[in-house]
Amino acid sequence: MCLFLCVLCVLCGVMKIAHLSDPHLTSLDPVRWRELLNKRILGYLSWRLRRRRAHSREILSRTLAHLAGQQPDHLVISGDLTHLGAASECREAETWLNRIGAPDYISIVPGNHDRYIAADPEQTLGRWRAYMQSDPDAAARGPQFPYLRVRGPVALIGLSSAVPTPPFYASGRLGEEQLQHLSHLLEATAQQGLYRIVTLHHSPHSMSSRRGLSDAGALLSTLAGPGAELVIHGHGHRQMQATLQAGARRIPVFGVPSASASYNDPAKAPGYYIYEVNKLPSGWQACAKSFILNEETQEFEQGSLGGDLTT
């Protein structure tokens, strides 16, 4: 069914949203030692011993080049651009973002690695603010998150699940205020007849308390009211797919693998997704495609993600 829908999407005028995550694109070589006198020292040692070989800028460049060939209308990055969220990393990520696209083309939500500890936002995440803010005329009011960006028939709603955590924890939390604003945005965009894509870093489905979204239940309750057409995330570094049963609603959820992974593990092969959305008189026609790097052939292989995204 999904393959059939994808064929239809190609034949019709559609909105193409690309989705990648967890590029971990930065180097820790410029990080100053005084920035490591906290939880970051553990992440730094992990990077020195293992993680710097788990992610490749060369693979990330190949992923972006292949993605560009799909000519998406918009790119969503669901967090973890950095390793430790240090100031030098955030500057490096800012330079990378400016090179690959303008803020009106790219939407970001932060990941747990981007907010590893509490830090001066102007020196860290604030550098990406242009990629994480609502349209000037959007219905969003109040804090930075959730933001609302409307592209064609699609409402892109970005949440921040990135909060500082204790050592050895990579969990996330949205908080009551953010969820209240989310409910208002979902209602407003439903009234506008938009296809609502909600993005966050952490999976809204069950994970361990050490890595999961602590208020996933509250998110589910929020979605049960006004609903959403699609929820997307990163964090897992592997292809993930589920369905949220939000009251009477069934909402598809897709988790994309890391865009730069070099684990030599087929289950964690790098790649990205494309979501194609078309507005019909009878409702929505939509499909999701995966593009995953085959480590043997070194080619990106296209697949259709299961599940019916039409409404």
Could you describe each region identified by the protein language model?
Residues 1, 5-12:
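Short, low-complexity, charge-dense intrinsically disordered segments
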Residues 24-28, 83-86, 112-120, 164-168, ...:
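Active-site environment of divalent metal-dependent phosphoester hydrolases
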Residues 208-281:
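Conserved beta-sheet core of the metallophosphoesterase superfamily
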Residues 277-311:
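A short C-terminal boundary segment appended to hydrolase-like catalytic domains
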Residues 91-181, 224, 247-250, 274:
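Extended active-site neighborhood of metal-dependent phosphoesterases/phosphodiesterases
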Residues 186-207:
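Short acidic, glycine-rich surface-loop motifs adjacent to enzyme active sites
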Residues 19-21, 74-79, 106-112, 160, ...:
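Active-site neighborhood of phospho(di)ester-bond hydrolases with catalytic His/Asp-centered motifs
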Residues 13-92:
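N-terminal active-site segment of His-dependent metallophosphoesterases
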